[in-house]
UniProtKB/Swiss-Prot annotation:
Domain of life: Bacteria
Main function: Allows the formation of correctly charged Gln-tRNA(Gln) through the transamidation of misacylated Glu-tRNA(Gln) in organisms which lack glutaminyl-tRNA synthetase. The reaction takes place in the presence of glutamine and ATP through an activated gamma-phospho-Glu-tRNA(Gln).
Entry keyword annotation includes Chloroplast: no
Similarity annotation: Belongs to the amidase family. GatA subfamily.
GO MF annotations, alphabetized: ATP binding; glutaminyl-tRNA synthase (glutamine-hydrolyzing) activity
Catalytic activity, reaction form: L-glutamyl-tRNA(Gln) + L-glutamine + ATP + H2O = L-glutaminyl-tRNA(Gln) + L-glutamate + ADP + phosphate + H(+)
Gene: gatA
Protein name: Glutamyl-tRNA(Gln) amidotransferase subunit A
Originating species: Streptococcus gordonii (strain Challis / ATCC 35105 / BCRC 15272 / CH1 / DL1 / V288)
Gene3D superfamilies attached to this UniProt entry: Amidase signature (AS) domain
Length: 488
């Protein structure tokens, strides 16, 4: 028996009425994973024993009728710490690492009696846009196994798209939730920087990283964000901003809502079919009463260059801790301390991670700091100011999530710059610390196209309002990959 077609509210109703138990729901989810995993390779670890133990304990305690998430299974990206469960960041460096603590976001999941069924595959240390940089396996697109699933949270996206789980957590540093959500036709949100605690997230770019939810529908996405949001004294960058119920505006109409469409988001490098799909989505939002107008974000064209200086610089600092001494991989053929560092890091890190460490170390080095890192910080401020000007007049910004649909596995491995440019439309949102969502908006060449909606700081509720209005009047979110029961 499978329950992957039921919403969280429907599953909650079944659990409360005792028509199914938490153990039965968990067993059904694990069965879905066993049946579907081979086609997509979403998981690094399936935590069957731990999940069933938590479900059994919950059945003994009883499902809380007032807690929507009680007994609901989900998957978690493998750079989010889970006590006693492998947390590898998809790297040889951490191939056997079992944390002795839970990330704050995981504590919040457990606090709502949610059940983690496994840890999902990703690009190593979240560095990549295709999930091909994993030490363990290559995740495949849920719609076409010859295409990339996007990255770095490819496993979290495909686990939802393939019907293995209804919900998952990912992390987003430059588009790592939104781009794979777009490529796999699911909902993925990057919250405002500081909305969700980063404590227990294996750091990549500390001024950019955010944990966020993947889901089948907009409302379920908001329901999961409700669980993981809030201030955390263990994370000095987490915000004191009050956390609303993110479902509050879902169902409200969008008449009079002002939405900006930046001309830079529809320019050079954007696939013509993707452009057509997004313009059709904009027209649809207008038919629902929204006012869509063209604007300019003039400094967004510098986003990719700025991002790869800042993110790589932060990564080169953050990844210094992986030295073969405290924990993680240590090379065997060593004769002195220098060997420990050089050989362990050379063997433990993959090519893309080493590339970014070198890029970041160069950008921070004396003689180059002012020309690169300092200058990137100044341009980042200009990008923030561009967004601030637009949000003085507009409620939301829309555009494509990615410039293309999913591309062939292996096609960009030798051209890192081409892969970096795939984040052209998502990176500025991270640089400005803004919230952004990708929702299914149509298809091009039989592959999903994501619509990105960007909101002002801490205004995820308005994003969800518009996204839900679009979803309620279209059928794109209901379409499933043929391999997993969808229609041709």
């Amino acid at each position: 028996m499978t329950f992957n077609h039921k919403t969280i509210e429907e599953l909650h109703d079944l659990l409360v009425k005792k028509e199914i138990s938490a153990v039965e729901l968990t067993q059904a989810t694990l069965a879905d994973i066993k049946e579907r995993e081979g086609a997509v390779d979403s998981f690094i670890t399936v935590s069957e024993e731990e999940a069933l133990a938590k479900a059994a304990a919950l059945d003994a305690k009883g499902i809380d009728a007032d807690n929507l998430m009680s007994g609901i299974p989900l998957a978690v990206k493998d750079n989010i710490s889970t006590k006693g469960i492998l947390t590898t960041a998809a790297s040889k460096m951490l191939y056997n690492y079992k944390p002795i603590f839970d990330a704050t976001s995981v504590e919040k999941l457990y606090g709502k009696d949610m059940i983690i069924v496994g840890k999902t595959n990703m690009d190593e240390f979240a560095m990549g846009g295709s999930s091909e940089n994993s030490y363990f396996k290559t995740t495949k697109n849920a719609w076409d196994g010859s295409k990339v699933p996007g990255g770095s949270s490819g496993g979290s996206a495909t686990a939802v798209a393939s019907g293995q789980v209804r919900l998952s957590l990912g992390s987003d540093t430059g588009g790592s939730i939104r781009q794979p959500a777009s490529f796999n036709g699911v909902v993925g949100l990057k919250p405002t920087y500081g909305r969700v605690s980063r404590f227990g997230l294996i750091a990549f770019g500390s001024s950019l990283d955010q944990i966020g939810p993947f889901s089948q529908t907009v409302k379920e996405n908001a329901q999961l964000l409700n669980v993981i949001s809030g201030n955390d004294p263990k994370d000095s960058t987490s915000s004191q901003e009050a956390v609303p119920d993110f479902t509050n505006k879902i169902g409200q109409d969008i008449k009079g809502m002002k939405i900006a469409l930046p001309k830079e988001y529809m320019g050079e490098g954007i696939d013509s079919k993707v452009k057509e799909t997004i313009l059709a989505a904009a027209k649809h939002l207008e038919s629902l009463g929204a006012i869509v107008e063209e604007v300019s974000l003039p400094h967004s064209k510098y986003g990719v260059a700025v991002y790869y200086i800042i993110a790589s610089s932060e990564a080169s600092s953050n990844l210094q801790r992986f030295d073969g001494i405290r924990y993680g991989y240590r090379a065997e053929d060593i004769e002195n301390l220098e060997d420990v560092y050089v050989k362990s890091r050379s063997e433990g890190f993959g090519e893309e991670v080493k590339r970014r460490i070198m890029l970041g170390t160069f950008s921070l080095s004396s003689g180059y700091y002012d020309a690169y890192f300092k200058k990137a910080g100044q341009v980042r401020t200009l990008i923030m100011q561009d967004f601030a000007k637009v949000f003085e007049k507009y409620d939301l910004i829309l555009g494509p999530t990615a410039p293309t649909v999913a591309y062939d596995l292996g096609s960009q491995n030798q051209d890192p710059v081409a892969m970096y440019l795939a984040d052209l439309l998502t990176i500025p949102v991270n640089l400005a610390g803004l919230p952004g969502i990708s929702i299914p908006a149509g298809f091009a060449d039989g592959l999903p196209v994501g619509l990105q909606l960007i909101g002002n700081h801490f205004d995820e509720a308005t994003i969800y309002q518009a996204a839900a209005a679009f979803e309620a009047t279209t059928d794109y979110h209901k379409q499933q990959p043929v391999i997993f029961g969808g229609e041709k």
